Amino acid sequence: MPVVYVNIFLAFIVSLMGLLIYRSHLMSSLLCLEGMMLSLFVMLTVTVLNNHFTLANMAPIILLVFAACEAALGLSLLVMVSNTYGTDYVQNLNLLQC
């Protein structure tokens, strides 16, 4: 396995660990999720370019579009939660609290 793939995989694992460990604030969760999407995008792009998949040339662009949509929804949720509650804690997202 080349060093490039190992580095990208480690970036994905570090982002995943950050998502699992620092999940109290919504902003840190969104940043870790963006890091995961960026590492997936780079891994998919390198794989498509190295293996010359002609049918999968659009896959990195489609993944990038989904990442942009996810970022827009996440930031709108962050603005809504911070305007409503004053903080960006993830525990404020639970609407079933009694």
UniProtKB/Swiss-Prot annotation:
It is a multi-pass membrane protein. Core subunit of respiratory chain NADH dehydrogenase (Complex I) which is composed of 45 different subunits. Belongs to the complex I subunit 4L family. GO terms for cellular component: mitochondrial inner membrane; respiratory chain complex I. It comes from Ursus americanus. It is found in: Mitochondrion inner membrane. The keyword Ribosomal protein does not apply. The chain crosses the membrane at residues 1-21, 29-49, 61-81. It catalyses: a ubiquinone + NADH + 5 H(+)(in) = a ubiquinol + NAD(+) + 4 H(+)(out). The gene is MT-ND4L. It comes from the Eukaryota. Its EC number is 7.1.1.2. InterPro entries: NADH_UbQ_OxRdtase_chain4L/K (IPR001133), NUOK/Mnh_C1-like (IPR039428). Its main location: mitochondrion. This is NADH-ubiquinone oxidoreductase chain 4L.
